[in-house]
Each structure stands twice: as structure tokens, then as C-alpha cells.
Amino acid sequence: MTTKRLLSLLIFITSLSVSYAQGYINSTMMYDGLTREYSFYVPASYDGTTSFPLLFNFHGGNGVIADWQTTADMRPIADTANFILVYPQARQDPSDGNSLNWLPKTPGTFDDVPFISALIDTIASDYQIDQNRIYACGYSLGGEFSYELACKLNSKIAAIGAVARTMQADPNSYCSPVHPTGVLTILGTDDFISPYNGLTFGGIEYYISAEATHSYWATHNNCDTTATMNTVSPSVERYTWSTASGCAYVEELKVIGGG
């Protein structure tokens, strides 16, 4: 089972017995001289009297909002958990043939972290948002960008989820979280695009391993560095680093043979 299929299955299971949700609201905002697109969903339970959590869901590299909403439609979950759901659109990356990327390829220099910060402020100007419960999740490059937000927009991001991606190399050089930050990963052991054991090419490390990724966050989050494992299915193992006092959880769904 691929990690992308597992994500779809998890969303499907969570949404069982839930009536179909209402539609998305498509919108734009000007940022850094560009018209940026995003699509969001407000549950019917929102009436403006109670602050709602905010969840960002980021598509993968060269993805588009509409396709990702079809693959990862979280509206039924937003209805039951009562949060506002946002799907932003990545910008064109001139260093990568104008593909749609959250992070620029070398020698590109754009930075979308401030854009997400501005988008949070824009949405919060129109809706009552619980500023202590703003979350990010994403698939592949979207998962990598979720780590980026946990590292560089940590004052606004409470927790993240990353599917099919480990962290970039040497996180201590760029990651400066200011509070314990919950982290959930869904990683396939046979993923050749984002290898489970990290990626080193030509003697240069580009991505650290799943083990190193979880160790980084378990240490930062004051968790026990030894995980507890239980079997979810013959192909999925669940690891949790959450037993120490004051720990902000770290959790992995490890897909055996997943790519």
C-alpha cells in the first residue's frame, strides 16, 4: 500500500457515517506582488461566537488545489472536529521550469513561509481563529513545507503532519522551534522519491532518515526517545514518542513496503 493511498484511506475511514460537507470557498490575496490562490472550507457549525482551529493542507510538488482536494477531501473531518480547513496553492518556481513548488530549487530564493503567516492573518481578520490551534499537514513536498512551518513559523504553528517526506539535512542549522510541537508522520519504507532512510547523493546529505527525523522532534518535544510500537495492520506499524512528562507527542505510521 502506498503512503498516498494510506492517507486517502485514513480520510475515508474518518469520514464514514458523516453526511457530505458543503462547498469550498475559492479566494485570492496579493502577496509579494503576486496574486496567490487558496481555497477554504468553513463548517456549518461555525457561527462567529466561538474561535475555531485552523488547518492547512498542502499539496505535493507541482500540484494544484483542485486535484489535492479530490485526493484529500477533509471537509467531513472538519465538520465533526469543528475546524476551518485551508488548501493554499504553491507558486511557480522559475528555477524548476515554473513548476508549482512550496520550496525553491537551487538557485531560487523565494520563501513562502511569510506568505502562510500573512494568510493566517488574512483569514483571522474574517473569522474567529483559535491562535493556539493552527496546524499544517501535507503530502511529499507539502509535507516538507509543513516541517518548514514548524521550524520557521513555530510561533503560529501548534502541530504538523507530514506524509511521504522526512526532514531536510542538518535540521539544527535551520530549525528553531520556540515551543514543543506535535508531529505526525506517515512514511513508506520503500518510497524511492523520499527514501525512508534518508537521501545522500555524491557525498552530500539532502534528507535525514525517518529515525533521525523522529529523534529530532522527540528530543525537542521533551519526549522519551524510545518509541512504543503497536501493530495497526500487517503493513502498518504505529510508533509513539509520548511517554515522558511534559512531552508534546511525536507519532509515526510506518507503512511496510509503502512507496
Write out the residue ranges for each language-model feature.
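Gly/Ser-rich "nucleophile elbow"/oxyanion-hole loop immediately N-terminal to the catalytic nucleophile
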Residues: 44-50, 98-141, 151-154
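Bacterial Sec-dependent N-terminal signal peptides
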Residues: 1-23
